[in-house]
Protein backbone atom coordinates (compact mmCIF):
# COMPACT_ATOMS: atom_id res chain seq x y z
CA UNK A 1 0.00 0.00 0.00
CA UNK A 2 1.15 3.51 -0.73
CA UNK A 3 -0.13 6.73 0.82
CA UNK A 4 -0.11 10.17 -0.78
CA UNK A 5 -1.32 13.46 0.64
CA UNK A 6 -3.64 15.51 -1.56
CA UNK A 7 -3.16 19.12 -0.49
CA UNK A 8 -5.99 21.55 0.06
CA UNK A 9 -5.12 23.46 -3.09
CA UNK A 10 -5.31 20.29 -5.18
CA UNK A 11 -8.29 18.64 -3.49
CA UNK A 12 -10.93 19.63 -5.99
CA UNK A 13 -8.65 19.06 -8.95
CA UNK A 14 -7.77 15.57 -7.78
CA UNK A 15 -11.43 14.73 -7.35
CA UNK A 16 -12.12 15.87 -10.91
CA UNK A 17 -9.12 13.82 -12.04
CA UNK A 18 -10.61 10.60 -10.63
CA UNK A 19 -14.11 11.48 -11.76
CA UNK A 20 -13.26 12.58 -15.30
CA UNK A 21 -14.84 10.73 -18.22
CA UNK A 22 -12.21 11.87 -20.71
CA UNK A 23 -9.56 9.57 -22.10
CA UNK A 24 -6.44 11.18 -20.61
CA UNK A 25 -7.03 11.06 -16.85
CA UNK A 26 -7.75 7.92 -14.84
CA UNK A 27 -11.38 6.99 -14.69
CA UNK A 28 -12.92 4.62 -12.21
CA UNK A 29 -11.77 1.11 -13.08
CA UNK A 30 -10.92 2.14 -16.65
CA UNK A 31 -13.89 -0.21 -17.03
CA UNK A 32 -15.02 -1.00 -20.54
CA UNK A 33 -18.28 -2.52 -21.58
CA UNK A 34 -18.18 -5.79 -23.57
CA UNK A 35 -18.19 -3.79 -26.80
CA UNK A 36 -15.26 -1.68 -25.64
CA UNK A 37 -17.09 1.51 -24.69
CA UNK A 38 -16.15 3.40 -21.50
CA UNK A 39 -18.67 2.87 -18.70
CA UNK A 40 -19.53 4.98 -15.70
CA UNK A 41 -18.21 2.36 -13.19
CA UNK A 42 -18.69 4.88 -10.35
CA UNK A 43 -16.64 4.79 -7.21
CA UNK A 44 -18.21 3.76 -3.92
CA UNK A 45 -18.52 5.70 -0.68
CA UNK A 46 -16.96 4.07 2.37
CA UNK A 47 -19.00 5.54 5.22
CA UNK A 48 -21.97 4.60 7.37
CA UNK A 49 -25.50 5.37 6.09
CA UNK A 50 -25.98 7.87 8.94
CA UNK A 51 -22.84 9.79 7.97
CA UNK A 52 -23.78 9.83 4.30
CA UNK A 53 -27.23 11.12 5.25
CA UNK A 54 -25.64 13.94 7.30
CA UNK A 55 -23.68 14.88 4.20
CA UNK A 56 -26.77 14.83 2.02
CA UNK A 57 -25.48 11.86 0.00
CA UNK A 58 -28.01 9.33 -1.22
CA UNK A 59 -26.78 5.82 -1.98
CA UNK A 60 -23.26 4.43 -1.97
CA UNK A 61 -22.32 5.26 -5.56
CA UNK A 62 -20.21 8.38 -5.91
CA UNK A 63 -21.50 11.33 -7.85
CA UNK A 64 -18.78 13.62 -9.13
CA UNK A 65 -19.98 16.92 -7.61
CA UNK A 66 -20.33 15.32 -4.16
CA UNK A 67 -16.78 14.00 -4.17
CA UNK A 68 -15.39 17.26 -5.51
CA UNK A 69 -17.17 19.22 -2.76
CA UNK A 70 -15.77 17.01 -0.01
CA UNK A 71 -12.26 17.23 -1.45
CA UNK A 72 -12.65 21.01 -1.35
CA UNK A 73 -13.72 20.76 2.30
CA UNK A 74 -17.36 21.70 1.62
CA UNK A 75 -20.71 20.11 2.47
CA UNK A 76 -21.96 18.42 -0.74
CA UNK A 77 -25.43 20.00 -0.45
CA UNK A 78 -25.09 23.34 1.36
CA UNK A 79 -21.63 24.20 0.08
CA UNK A 80 -20.61 25.37 3.56
CA UNK A 81 -17.12 24.59 4.79
CA UNK A 82 -17.07 21.52 7.02
CA UNK A 83 -13.91 22.30 8.93
CA UNK A 84 -11.62 25.09 10.02
CA UNK A 85 -8.95 26.46 7.76
CA UNK A 86 -5.51 24.96 8.24
CA UNK A 87 -2.26 26.80 8.84
CA UNK A 88 -2.03 27.70 5.15
CA UNK A 89 -5.70 28.69 4.91
CA UNK A 90 -6.77 25.52 3.11
CA UNK A 91 -9.79 23.47 4.17
CA UNK A 92 -9.83 20.64 1.62
CA UNK A 93 -7.66 17.79 0.52
CA UNK A 94 -7.35 14.23 1.71
CA UNK A 95 -5.17 11.14 1.70
CA UNK A 96 -5.05 8.70 -1.21
CA UNK A 97 -4.31 5.11 -0.13
CA UNK A 98 -3.52 2.79 -3.05
CA UNK A 99 -3.90 -0.94 -2.42
CA UNK A 100 -2.19 -2.79 -5.26
CA UNK A 101 -2.45 -6.58 -5.60
CA UNK A 102 0.65 -8.73 -6.23
CA UNK A 103 1.32 -9.11 -9.95
CA UNK A 104 0.38 -12.82 -9.91
CA UNK A 105 -3.11 -11.92 -8.65
CA UNK A 106 -3.53 -9.47 -11.52
CA UNK A 107 -2.21 -12.09 -13.97
CA UNK A 108 -4.77 -14.67 -12.84
CA UNK A 109 -7.48 -12.00 -13.02
CA UNK A 110 -6.48 -11.15 -16.60
CA UNK A 111 -5.86 -14.67 -17.91
CA UNK A 112 -8.26 -16.84 -15.94
CA UNK A 113 -11.87 -17.68 -16.70
CA UNK A 114 -14.84 -15.53 -15.70
CA UNK A 115 -15.17 -17.24 -12.33
CA UNK A 116 -11.50 -16.66 -11.51
CA UNK A 117 -11.85 -13.01 -12.45
CA UNK A 118 -14.77 -12.64 -10.07
CA UNK A 119 -12.86 -14.50 -7.35
CA UNK A 120 -9.79 -12.27 -7.70
CA UNK A 121 -11.93 -9.13 -7.56
CA UNK A 122 -13.85 -10.40 -4.52
CA UNK A 123 -10.67 -11.40 -2.65
CA UNK A 124 -9.07 -8.05 -3.42
CA UNK A 125 -12.18 -6.13 -2.31
CA UNK A 126 -12.45 -8.09 0.94
CA UNK A 127 -8.76 -7.53 1.74
CA UNK A 128 -9.04 -3.77 1.18
CA UNK A 129 -12.13 -3.68 3.39
CA UNK A 130 -10.33 -5.57 6.17
CA UNK A 131 -7.30 -3.28 5.93
CA UNK A 132 -9.45 -0.16 6.14
CA UNK A 133 -11.24 -1.57 9.19
CA UNK A 134 -7.85 -2.22 10.79
CA UNK A 135 -6.75 1.34 10.02
CA UNK A 136 -9.88 2.81 11.59
CA UNK A 137 -9.53 0.62 14.69
CA UNK A 138 -5.81 1.10 15.33
CA UNK A 139 -4.62 4.36 13.74
CA UNK A 140 -5.47 7.70 15.40
CA UNK A 141 -6.83 9.74 12.51
CA UNK A 142 -8.08 12.75 14.49
CA UNK A 143 -5.93 15.55 15.87
CA UNK A 144 -7.33 18.00 18.45
CA UNK A 145 -6.20 20.27 21.29
CA UNK A 146 -6.69 19.71 25.01
CA UNK A 147 -5.41 22.35 27.45
CA UNK A 148 -3.15 23.80 24.80
CA UNK A 149 -1.65 20.41 23.91
CA UNK A 150 -2.20 18.74 20.55
CA UNK A 151 -3.16 15.07 20.86
CA UNK A 152 -4.06 12.31 18.43
CA UNK A 153 -7.10 10.12 18.96
CA UNK A 154 -9.13 7.52 17.12
CA UNK A 155 -12.03 8.53 14.91
CA UNK A 156 -15.47 7.00 15.14
CA UNK A 157 -15.16 6.43 11.40
CA UNK A 158 -13.61 7.94 8.29
CA UNK A 159 -15.30 9.15 5.12
CA UNK A 160 -13.61 7.77 2.03
CA UNK A 161 -14.18 7.32 -1.69
CA UNK A 162 -13.09 4.03 -3.25
CA UNK A 163 -12.21 3.65 -6.93
CA UNK A 164 -11.52 0.25 -8.47
CA UNK A 165 -8.84 0.00 -11.16
CA UNK A 166 -7.66 -3.03 -13.09
CA UNK A 167 -4.79 -1.84 -15.29
CA UNK A 168 -1.55 0.04 -14.88
CA UNK A 169 -0.56 2.97 -17.02
CA UNK A 170 0.79 2.42 -20.47
CA UNK A 171 4.48 3.12 -21.00
CA UNK A 172 6.14 5.79 -23.08
CA UNK A 173 7.41 3.14 -25.49
CA UNK A 174 3.83 2.76 -26.66
CA UNK A 175 2.88 -0.56 -25.07
CA UNK A 176 -0.67 -0.95 -23.82
CA UNK A 177 -1.42 -1.11 -20.11
CA UNK A 178 -0.62 -4.25 -18.12
CA UNK A 179 -3.18 -5.89 -15.85
CA UNK A 180 -2.89 -4.46 -12.34
CA UNK A 181 -5.70 -4.83 -9.82
CA UNK A 182 -5.62 -1.89 -7.44
CA UNK A 183 -7.97 0.36 -5.51
CA UNK A 184 -7.68 4.02 -4.59
CA UNK A 185 -9.24 4.79 -1.22
CA UNK A 186 -9.31 8.56 -0.81
CA UNK A 187 -10.00 9.58 2.79
CA UNK A 188 -11.65 12.98 2.79
CA UNK A 189 -12.79 13.43 6.40
CA UNK A 190 -12.85 11.86 9.85
CA UNK A 191 -15.77 11.73 12.27
CA UNK A 192 -14.79 12.44 15.87
CA UNK A 193 -16.39 10.55 18.78
CA UNK A 194 -18.53 13.64 19.44
CA UNK A 195 -19.83 13.45 15.87
CA UNK A 196 -17.98 16.48 14.51
CA UNK A 197 -16.67 16.21 10.94
CA UNK A 198 -12.99 17.15 10.87
CA UNK A 199 -9.89 16.90 8.71
CA UNK A 200 -7.90 13.69 8.71
CA UNK A 201 -4.61 13.63 10.64
CA UNK A 202 -2.19 12.50 7.94
CA UNK A 203 0.98 11.84 9.93
CA UNK A 204 -0.34 8.83 11.89
CA UNK A 205 -1.52 7.30 8.62
CA UNK A 206 1.87 7.75 6.98
CA UNK A 207 3.56 6.28 10.07
CA UNK A 208 1.25 3.26 9.85
CA UNK A 209 1.45 2.78 6.07
CA UNK A 210 3.72 -0.27 6.25
CA UNK A 211 1.53 -1.96 8.87
CA UNK A 212 -1.73 -1.28 7.00
CA UNK A 213 -0.16 -2.47 3.74
CA UNK A 214 1.08 -5.64 5.43
CA UNK A 215 -2.39 -6.21 6.90
CA UNK A 216 -3.92 -5.86 3.43
CA UNK A 217 -1.52 -8.40 1.90
CA UNK A 218 -2.04 -10.82 4.79
CA UNK A 219 -5.81 -10.53 4.39
CA UNK A 220 -5.53 -10.99 0.61
CA UNK A 221 -3.37 -14.11 1.02
CA UNK A 222 -5.91 -15.49 3.50
CA UNK A 223 -8.78 -14.80 1.08
CA UNK A 224 -6.91 -16.52 -1.77
CA UNK A 225 -6.09 -19.57 0.34
CA UNK A 226 -9.75 -19.89 1.28
CA UNK A 227 -10.46 -20.03 -2.46
CA UNK A 228 -7.95 -22.83 -3.05
CA UNK A 229 -4.78 -20.99 -4.12
CA UNK A 230 -1.33 -21.71 -2.68
CA UNK A 231 0.84 -18.82 -1.51
CA UNK A 232 4.55 -18.24 -2.07
CA UNK A 233 5.88 -15.97 0.68
CA UNK A 234 9.06 -13.86 0.78
CA UNK A 235 8.99 -12.26 -2.67
CA UNK A 236 9.64 -8.67 -3.71
CA UNK A 237 11.72 -6.00 -2.00
CA UNK A 238 13.19 -7.22 1.30
CA UNK A 239 11.01 -10.35 1.04
CA UNK A 240 7.93 -8.49 2.30
CA UNK A 241 5.50 -9.65 -0.37
CA UNK A 242 3.91 -12.81 -1.78
CA UNK A 243 2.69 -14.30 -5.04
CA UNK A 244 0.25 -17.03 -6.04
CA UNK A 245 2.28 -20.22 -6.37
CA UNK A 246 2.54 -21.61 -9.90
CA UNK A 247 2.45 -18.36 -11.90
CA UNK A 248 5.69 -18.17 -13.96
CA UNK A 249 8.10 -15.50 -12.75
CA UNK A 250 8.98 -14.60 -16.32
CA UNK A 251 5.32 -13.82 -17.01
CA UNK A 252 5.16 -11.54 -13.97
CA UNK A 253 8.16 -9.61 -15.29
CA UNK A 254 6.65 -9.40 -18.78
CA UNK A 255 3.43 -7.96 -17.33
CA UNK A 256 5.36 -5.29 -15.37
CA UNK A 257 6.41 -2.91 -18.15
CA UNK A 258 5.51 0.15 -16.08
CA UNK A 259 7.73 -0.98 -13.19
CA UNK A 260 10.61 -1.59 -15.58
CA UNK A 261 10.17 1.87 -17.09
CA UNK A 262 10.37 3.52 -13.66
CA UNK A 263 13.40 1.35 -12.78
CA UNK A 264 15.17 2.49 -15.96
CA UNK A 265 14.42 6.12 -15.08
CA UNK A 266 15.89 5.52 -11.62
CA UNK A 267 19.05 4.03 -13.18
CA UNK A 268 19.43 7.08 -15.42
CA UNK A 269 19.11 9.25 -12.32
CA UNK A 270 21.80 7.19 -10.57
CA UNK A 271 24.14 7.48 -13.56
CA UNK A 272 23.69 11.27 -13.64
CA UNK A 273 23.89 12.03 -9.92
CA UNK A 274 25.89 9.11 -8.52
CA UNK A 275 23.23 8.03 -6.02
CA UNK A 276 19.80 6.45 -5.85
CA UNK A 277 16.79 8.81 -5.97
CA UNK A 278 15.17 9.59 -2.65
CA UNK A 279 11.45 9.04 -2.05
CA UNK A 280 10.31 12.45 -3.31
CA UNK A 281 12.64 12.28 -6.30
CA UNK A 282 11.43 8.78 -7.16
CA UNK A 283 7.84 10.01 -7.07
CA UNK A 284 8.81 12.83 -9.46
CA UNK A 285 10.44 10.30 -11.80
CA UNK A 286 7.23 8.29 -11.87
CA UNK A 287 5.26 11.39 -12.80
CA UNK A 288 7.76 12.46 -15.47
CA UNK A 289 7.84 9.03 -17.08
CA UNK A 290 4.18 8.19 -17.14
CA UNK A 291 1.84 7.97 -20.05
CA UNK A 292 -1.81 8.90 -19.87
CA UNK A 293 -4.23 5.99 -19.66
CA UNK A 294 -5.21 4.88 -23.13
CA UNK A 295 -8.68 3.37 -23.33
CA UNK A 296 -8.55 0.42 -25.65
CA UNK A 297 -11.16 -2.30 -25.84
CA UNK A 298 -11.07 -5.17 -23.40
CA UNK A 299 -10.84 -7.48 -26.39
CA UNK A 300 -7.72 -5.68 -27.63
CA UNK A 301 -6.08 -5.92 -24.23
CA UNK A 302 -7.04 -9.57 -23.88
CA UNK A 303 -5.35 -10.46 -27.16
CA UNK A 304 -2.09 -8.85 -26.02
CA UNK A 305 -2.24 -10.43 -22.56
CA UNK A 306 -3.02 -13.88 -23.97
CA UNK A 307 -0.11 -13.65 -26.41
CA UNK A 308 2.20 -12.70 -23.55
CA UNK A 309 0.92 -15.62 -21.45
CA UNK A 310 1.48 -18.07 -24.32
CA UNK A 311 5.18 -17.17 -24.41
CA UNK A 312 5.45 -18.47 -20.85
CA UNK A 313 3.18 -21.52 -21.29
CA UNK A 314 0.42 -20.01 -19.18
CA UNK A 315 -2.37 -19.68 -21.73
CA UNK A 316 -5.62 -21.60 -22.09
CA UNK A 317 -6.70 -23.44 -18.98
CA UNK A 318 -3.34 -23.11 -17.21
CA UNK A 319 -4.64 -20.45 -14.76
CA UNK A 320 -7.49 -22.72 -13.65
CA UNK A 321 -4.98 -25.49 -12.87
CA UNK A 322 -3.56 -23.32 -10.09
CA UNK A 323 -6.46 -24.32 -7.88
CA UNK A 324 -5.47 -27.04 -5.46
CA UNK A 325 -1.73 -27.06 -6.15
CA UNK A 326 0.70 -26.86 -3.25
CA UNK A 327 3.62 -24.48 -2.94
CA UNK A 328 7.14 -25.89 -3.01
CA UNK A 329 8.16 -26.55 0.61
CA UNK A 330 11.12 -24.50 1.77
CA UNK A 331 13.00 -25.17 5.02
CA UNK A 332 12.33 -22.24 7.31
CA UNK A 333 12.96 -21.29 10.89
CA UNK A 334 10.05 -20.92 13.28
CA UNK A 335 7.87 -17.89 12.62
CA UNK A 336 8.78 -16.16 15.89
CA UNK A 337 12.50 -16.57 15.13
CA UNK A 338 12.08 -15.12 11.64
CA UNK A 339 10.20 -12.14 13.05
CA UNK A 340 12.87 -11.42 15.66
CA UNK A 341 15.64 -11.65 13.06
CA UNK A 342 13.89 -9.22 10.71
CA UNK A 343 13.10 -6.76 13.50
CA UNK A 344 16.71 -6.42 14.61
CA UNK A 345 18.48 -6.51 11.25
CA UNK A 346 19.13 -2.77 11.29
CA UNK A 347 18.37 -1.52 14.79
CA UNK A 348 18.20 -2.79 18.35
CA UNK A 349 14.85 -1.09 18.95
CA UNK A 350 11.72 -0.69 16.86
CA UNK A 351 8.26 0.86 16.88
CA UNK A 352 5.23 -1.28 17.83
CA UNK A 353 3.81 -0.69 14.34
CA UNK A 354 6.98 -2.07 12.76
CA UNK A 355 6.69 -5.15 14.99
CA UNK A 356 3.14 -5.80 13.80
CA UNK A 357 4.08 -5.11 10.17
CA UNK A 358 6.99 -7.56 10.21
CA UNK A 359 4.87 -10.23 11.87
CA UNK A 360 2.12 -9.77 9.28
CA UNK A 361 4.68 -9.97 6.45
CA UNK A 362 6.43 -13.05 7.81
CA UNK A 363 3.20 -14.92 8.57
CA UNK A 364 1.55 -14.47 5.16
CA UNK A 365 0.04 -17.78 4.12
CA UNK A 366 0.65 -19.18 7.60
CA UNK A 367 -1.71 -17.11 9.73
CA UNK A 368 -4.69 -14.87 9.07
CA UNK A 369 -4.09 -11.21 9.92
CA UNK A 370 -6.15 -11.52 13.10
CA UNK A 371 -4.15 -14.59 14.14
CA UNK A 372 -0.92 -12.70 13.43
CA UNK A 373 -1.97 -9.85 15.72
CA UNK A 374 -2.91 -12.40 18.40
CA UNK A 375 0.62 -13.81 18.10
CA UNK A 376 2.09 -10.31 18.50
CA UNK A 377 0.31 -9.98 21.83
CA UNK A 378 1.47 -13.46 22.85
CA UNK A 379 5.11 -12.63 22.04
CA UNK A 380 4.85 -9.58 24.31
CA UNK A 381 3.16 -11.59 27.08
CA UNK A 382 5.90 -14.26 26.82
CA UNK A 383 8.54 -11.47 26.92
CA UNK A 384 10.11 -12.44 23.62
CA UNK A 385 9.41 -8.82 22.67
CA UNK A 386 9.97 -6.23 25.38
CA UNK A 387 8.28 -2.79 25.59
CA UNK A 388 10.72 -0.04 26.56
CA UNK A 389 10.37 3.47 27.94
CA UNK A 390 9.45 6.02 25.30
CA UNK A 391 7.21 3.66 23.34
CA UNK A 392 9.92 1.63 21.59
CA UNK A 393 10.44 -2.13 21.80
CA UNK A 394 13.28 -4.64 21.59
CA UNK A 395 13.63 -8.42 21.64
CA UNK A 396 14.67 -10.56 24.57
CA UNK A 397 17.56 -11.94 22.50
CA UNK A 398 18.93 -8.45 21.77
CA UNK A 399 18.52 -7.39 25.40
CA UNK A 400 20.35 -10.53 26.55
CA UNK A 401 23.29 -9.72 24.24
CA UNK A 402 23.32 -6.12 25.44
CA UNK A 403 23.38 -7.25 29.05
CA UNK A 404 26.25 -9.64 28.27
CA UNK A 405 28.20 -6.77 26.68
CA UNK A 406 27.49 -4.49 29.64
CA UNK A 407 28.55 -7.23 32.08
CA UNK A 408 31.79 -7.88 30.19
CA UNK A 409 32.64 -4.19 29.88
CA UNK A 410 31.95 -3.62 33.57
CA UNK A 411 34.34 -6.48 34.30
CA UNK A 412 37.00 -5.02 32.02
CA UNK A 413 36.57 -1.60 33.61
CA UNK A 414 37.16 -2.99 37.10
CA UNK A 415 40.12 -5.19 36.15
CA UNK A 416 43.31 -3.27 36.82
CA UNK A 417 46.95 -4.06 37.33
CA UNK A 418 48.64 -2.77 34.16
CA UNK A 419 49.62 0.90 33.99
CA UNK A 420 52.09 2.30 31.47
CA UNK A 421 53.53 4.63 34.09
CA UNK A 422 53.82 8.39 34.27
CA UNK A 423 57.24 8.56 32.58
CA UNK A 424 56.14 6.67 29.45
CA UNK A 425 52.94 8.71 29.36
CA UNK A 426 54.80 12.03 29.56
CA UNK A 427 57.36 11.06 26.92
CA UNK A 428 54.71 9.78 24.53
CA UNK A 429 52.58 12.88 25.05
CA UNK A 430 55.48 15.20 24.27
CA UNK A 431 56.40 13.27 21.11
CA UNK A 432 52.84 13.17 19.81
CA UNK A 433 52.41 16.89 20.49
CA UNK A 434 55.71 17.69 18.80
CA UNK A 435 54.48 15.91 15.69
CA UNK A 436 51.64 18.43 15.35
CA UNK A 437 53.79 21.39 16.38
CA UNK A 438 52.13 22.19 19.68
CA UNK A 439 51.26 20.90 23.13
CA UNK A 440 48.50 18.71 24.46
CA UNK A 441 45.68 20.72 26.00
CA UNK A 442 44.62 20.06 29.58
CA UNK A 443 41.66 17.92 28.48
CA UNK A 444 43.84 15.99 26.02
CA UNK A 445 46.42 15.32 28.75
CA UNK A 446 43.64 14.12 31.05
CA UNK A 447 42.26 11.88 28.29
CA UNK A 448 45.72 10.39 27.75
CA UNK A 449 45.98 9.60 31.46
CA UNK A 450 42.55 7.91 31.51
CA UNK A 451 43.01 5.68 28.46
CA UNK A 452 46.51 4.58 29.50
CA UNK A 453 45.35 3.75 33.02
CA UNK A 454 45.25 0.23 34.49
CA UNK A 455 41.64 -0.61 33.52
CA UNK A 456 41.13 -3.08 30.65
CA UNK A 457 38.01 -1.31 29.39
CA UNK A 458 37.96 2.48 28.90
CA UNK A 459 36.09 5.01 26.77
CA UNK A 460 37.25 8.11 24.87
CA UNK A 461 34.39 10.39 23.80
CA UNK A 462 34.85 13.22 21.36
CA UNK A 463 33.27 14.67 18.22
CA UNK A 464 35.24 15.28 15.04
CA UNK A 465 37.82 18.05 15.30
CA UNK A 466 38.60 17.67 19.02
CA UNK A 467 42.05 16.11 18.53
CA UNK A 468 41.30 12.47 19.27
CA UNK A 469 43.97 11.35 16.78
CA UNK A 470 46.89 12.89 18.69
CA UNK A 471 45.62 11.48 21.99
CA UNK A 472 45.36 7.97 20.52
CA UNK A 473 48.81 8.38 18.96
CA UNK A 474 50.29 9.35 22.33
CA UNK A 475 48.51 6.48 24.11
CA UNK A 476 49.73 3.90 21.59
CA UNK A 477 53.31 5.21 21.90
CA UNK A 478 53.12 4.94 25.70
CA UNK A 479 51.89 1.33 25.46
CA UNK A 480 54.64 0.47 23.00
CA UNK A 481 57.29 1.92 25.35
CA UNK A 482 56.08 -0.61 27.91
CA UNK A 483 56.52 -3.47 25.44
CA UNK A 484 52.81 -3.86 24.73
CA UNK A 485 51.27 -4.81 21.40
CA UNK A 486 48.93 -2.14 19.97
CA UNK A 487 46.24 -2.65 17.34
CA UNK A 488 43.74 -0.24 15.78
CA UNK A 489 40.34 -1.41 14.55
CA UNK A 490 37.15 0.07 13.08
CA UNK A 491 33.96 -1.27 11.53
CA UNK A 492 34.94 -0.07 8.04
CA UNK A 493 38.26 -0.56 6.32
CA UNK A 494 38.53 3.10 5.33
CA UNK A 495 38.10 4.23 8.95
CA UNK A 496 40.71 1.71 10.10
CA UNK A 497 43.13 3.02 7.48
CA UNK A 498 42.48 6.64 8.49
CA UNK A 499 43.11 5.69 12.14
CA UNK A 500 46.64 4.65 11.18
CA UNK A 501 47.15 7.93 9.33
CA UNK A 502 45.84 10.15 12.15
CA UNK A 503 47.74 8.18 14.80
CA UNK A 504 51.10 7.18 13.23
CA UNK A 505 52.01 4.95 16.17
CA UNK A 506 49.33 2.56 14.83
CA UNK A 507 50.47 2.75 11.19
CA UNK A 508 50.55 -0.75 9.71
CA UNK A 509 48.71 -2.15 12.73
CA UNK A 510 45.09 -1.40 11.81
CA UNK A 511 42.38 -3.74 10.51
CA UNK A 512 38.62 -4.08 10.57
CA UNK A 513 36.75 -5.34 13.63
CA UNK A 514 35.53 -8.39 11.69
CA UNK A 515 39.06 -9.25 10.58
CA UNK A 516 40.43 -9.01 14.12
CA UNK A 517 37.72 -11.20 15.66
CA UNK A 518 37.93 -13.75 12.85
CA UNK A 519 41.73 -14.04 13.09
CA UNK A 520 41.64 -14.35 16.86
CA UNK A 521 38.91 -17.01 16.74
CA UNK A 522 40.85 -19.03 14.15
CA UNK A 523 44.18 -18.66 15.95
CA UNK A 524 45.77 -16.52 13.22
CA UNK A 525 46.28 -13.52 15.53
CA UNK A 526 47.51 -13.74 19.11
CA UNK A 527 46.32 -11.16 21.63
CA UNK A 528 46.79 -11.31 25.40
CA UNK A 529 47.16 -9.14 28.52
CA UNK A 530 49.98 -7.28 26.81
CA UNK A 531 47.71 -6.17 23.92
CA UNK A 532 45.79 -2.89 23.73
CA UNK A 533 43.10 -2.51 21.05
CA UNK A 534 41.98 0.99 19.96
CA UNK A 535 38.47 0.79 18.51
CA UNK A 536 37.69 3.96 16.50
CA UNK A 537 34.11 5.04 15.76
CA UNK A 538 32.91 2.37 18.18
CA UNK A 539 29.38 3.78 18.07
CA UNK A 540 29.01 2.33 14.57
CA UNK A 541 29.38 -1.27 15.81
CA UNK A 542 26.17 -3.27 15.89
CA UNK A 543 25.29 -5.43 18.89
CA UNK A 544 26.41 -8.70 17.31
CA UNK A 545 29.87 -7.35 16.44
CA UNK A 546 30.28 -5.75 19.85
CA UNK A 547 29.23 -9.01 21.49
CA UNK A 548 31.93 -10.99 19.66
CA UNK A 549 34.60 -8.33 20.24
CA UNK A 550 34.04 -7.98 23.99
CA UNK A 551 33.95 -11.75 24.34
CA UNK A 552 37.34 -12.03 22.58
CA UNK A 553 38.82 -9.26 24.75
CA UNK A 554 37.47 -10.85 27.93
CA UNK A 555 38.78 -14.31 27.08
CA UNK A 556 42.26 -13.18 26.01
CA UNK A 557 42.85 -10.72 28.84
CA UNK A 558 43.59 -7.86 26.42
CA UNK A 559 42.61 -4.21 26.83
CA UNK A 560 39.97 -2.32 24.82
CA UNK A 561 39.85 1.45 24.32
CA UNK A 562 36.52 2.33 22.66
CA UNK A 563 36.59 5.70 20.89
CA UNK A 564 33.63 7.54 19.43
CA UNK A 565 30.78 9.99 19.72
CA UNK A 566 27.20 9.10 20.59
CA UNK A 567 26.05 11.82 18.17
CA UNK A 568 27.87 10.33 15.17
CA UNK A 569 26.35 8.04 12.53
CA UNK A 570 24.67 5.01 14.14
CA UNK A 571 25.49 1.38 13.46
CA UNK A 572 24.32 -0.31 10.26
CA UNK A 573 22.72 -3.12 12.26
CA UNK A 574 21.19 -3.27 15.72
CA UNK A 575 23.36 -1.19 18.03
CA UNK A 576 23.41 2.07 19.96
CA UNK A 577 25.39 0.88 23.01
CA UNK A 578 28.32 3.31 22.99
CA UNK A 579 26.61 5.91 25.16
CA UNK A 580 25.61 3.26 27.72
CA UNK A 581 29.13 1.82 27.89
CA UNK A 582 30.48 5.31 28.61
CA UNK A 583 28.46 5.25 31.84
CA UNK A 584 29.96 1.91 32.87
CA UNK A 585 33.67 2.35 32.22
CA UNK A 586 36.24 5.06 33.03
CA UNK A 587 35.70 7.74 30.38
CA UNK A 588 37.44 10.83 29.10
CA UNK A 589 35.64 13.50 27.10
CA UNK A 590 37.16 15.82 24.49
CA UNK A 591 34.84 18.76 23.87
CA UNK A 592 37.01 21.63 22.61
CA UNK A 593 37.00 21.97 18.82
CA UNK A 594 40.65 22.25 17.74
CA UNK A 595 40.10 22.15 13.99
CA UNK A 596 39.47 25.91 14.06
CA UNK A 597 40.54 28.66 16.47
CA UNK A 598 37.53 30.84 15.63
CA UNK A 599 35.23 30.69 18.71
CA UNK A 600 32.13 31.39 16.61
CA UNK A 601 32.97 28.50 14.28
CA UNK A 602 33.58 26.28 17.29
CA UNK A 603 30.15 27.16 18.69
CA UNK A 604 28.53 26.44 15.31
CA UNK A 605 30.15 22.98 15.24
CA UNK A 606 28.90 22.31 18.76
CA UNK A 607 25.41 23.54 17.86
CA UNK A 608 25.23 21.17 14.89
CA UNK A 609 26.30 18.20 17.00
CA UNK A 610 23.74 19.07 19.69
CA UNK A 611 20.92 19.37 17.17
CA UNK A 612 20.66 23.15 17.38
CA UNK A 613 20.74 23.47 13.61
CA UNK A 614 18.88 26.81 13.61
CA UNK A 615 21.73 28.48 15.52
CA UNK A 616 24.38 26.88 13.32
CA UNK A 617 22.58 27.90 10.12
CA UNK A 618 22.20 31.47 11.41
CA UNK A 619 25.97 31.61 11.97
CA UNK A 620 26.82 30.23 8.52
CA UNK A 621 24.30 32.61 6.92
CA UNK A 622 25.88 35.60 8.68
CA UNK A 623 29.28 34.55 7.29
CA UNK A 624 27.95 34.17 3.76
CA UNK A 625 28.66 30.44 3.92
CA UNK A 626 25.09 29.35 3.29
CA UNK A 627 24.11 29.05 -0.37
CA UNK A 628 20.52 28.36 -1.41
CA UNK A 629 19.42 26.59 -4.59
CA UNK A 630 15.96 25.76 -5.88
CA UNK A 631 16.37 21.98 -5.87
CA UNK A 632 18.55 19.34 -4.24
CA UNK A 633 20.07 18.46 -7.61
CA UNK A 634 21.09 22.07 -8.22
CA UNK A 635 22.60 22.25 -4.74
CA UNK A 636 24.64 19.07 -5.35
CA UNK A 637 25.83 20.42 -8.69
CA UNK A 638 26.89 23.75 -7.19
CA UNK A 639 28.68 22.01 -4.30
CA UNK A 640 30.62 19.85 -6.77
CA UNK A 641 31.73 22.96 -8.66
Give the location of each predicted region.
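Structural recognition of the conserved hydrophobic beta-strand(s) that form the central parallel beta-sheet
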Residues: 488, 559-565, 589
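Intrinsically disordered, flexible peripheral segments
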Residues: 1-338, 343-344, 351-360
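Short hydrophobic/aromatic beta-strand immediately N-terminal to the Walker A/P-loop
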Residues: 458-461, 561
